[in-house]
Amino acid sequence: MNSLTDKVLIMKFYEASNAGVKVDLIVRGTCCLRPGIKSVSENITVRSIVGRFLEHTRIYYFHHNGEKKFFLSSADLMTRNMEKRVEIMFPIFSGYLKQRITQWMQIMMSDNVKAREQSSDGTYHYVKRAEDEPIVDSQQTLFQLAYSVGEDEE
């Protein structure tokens, strides 16, 4: 997403973290949640990917009772979007689409070129790539995937 500023939803993320739920967030811009605080958000990571493209997907993925649930949305998690705008969120049922979205999320979570992780004090640092790790620029990789899609896949 682009922004996470809604206090109610941030508190829900903290509750989930305290219940032992692992939460990985990709928030391109403003993020008021603070990850990695003991007994508050120690199970939460926040990363930001800012590159050539104004890219911020709004994919919401949940693993619930052994079932993978995927949703796409028009909304960032901002109070104004939750309270004052008409937004939409819809589920993804297609197994094929779930596989593609999973691939995209894995690519974004593997980015070690443009990705930065947020520290508990709100500062960001670039993700460090291990020497034996391949270089992953998620925006470039996703661009190449989109460019290579055949007409029969559209």
Functional labels for PLM-detected ranges:
Residues 1-154:
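PLD/PLD-like phosphodiesterase catalytic module centered on the HKD motif
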